[in-house]
């Protein structure tokens, strides 16, 4: 198991965010982009997981590989993604996906309350099953 890097990036409303802000919670780092059809198709499943577990010591941080801020913000609103979102709007030149070995999207990383990676690339039913198993 690897401990995650702590980084700071701007939220879509321009507030800085750091992973250390979420210590003590399970955190799903959700790598996606507005221009990615498979990501947008997976979003309802992610929304469902968030609604089901947000009051059980769980949250999501959306990490976008967008380069157009307006399209990114519109996708967040259109897909009802009500958790924290970050992007440096650098597309694949962003350093954060590389930190987690992300080479394609959608992708995600599940961190335990200590910031340790406990699962990667869990989508669909696997996401629900993993959360059900680890979040008691």
Question: What role is predicted for each listed range?
Answer:
Residues 14-27:
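A short beta-strand-turn-helix
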Residues 41-79, 91-98:
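Structural microenvironment flanking redox-active thiols in thiol-disulfide oxidoreductases
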Residues 23-25, 55, 81, 102:
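Active-site acidic short loop of glycosyltransferases
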Residues 30, 60-64, 86:
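Short beta-strand segments
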Residues 2-15:
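Short, small-residue-biased leader/transition segments that mark boundaries at the very start
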Residues 81, 88-134:
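Thiol/disulfide oxidoreductase modules built on the thioredoxin-like
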Residues 23, 31-48:
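Conserved redox-active cysteine motifs that mediate thiol-disulfide chemistry
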């Amino acid at each position: 198991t690897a401990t995650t890097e702590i980084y700071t990036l701007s939220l879509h409303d321009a507030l800085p965010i750091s992973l250390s802000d979420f210590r003590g919670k399970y955190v799903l780092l959700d790598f996606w982009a507005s221009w990615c059809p498979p990501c947008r198709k997976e979003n309802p499943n992610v929304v469902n997981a968030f609604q089901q577990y947000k009051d059980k010591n769980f949250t999501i941080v959306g990490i976008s590989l967008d380069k157009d801020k307006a399209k990114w913000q519109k996708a967040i609103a259109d897909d009802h993604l009500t958790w924290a979102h970050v992007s440096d709007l650098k597309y694949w030149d962003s350093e954060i996906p590389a930190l987690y070995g992300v080479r394609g999207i959608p992708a995600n990383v599940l961190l335990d309350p200590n910031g340790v990676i406990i699962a990667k690339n869990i989508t669909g039913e696997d996401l629900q099953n993993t959360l059900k198993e680890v979040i008691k």
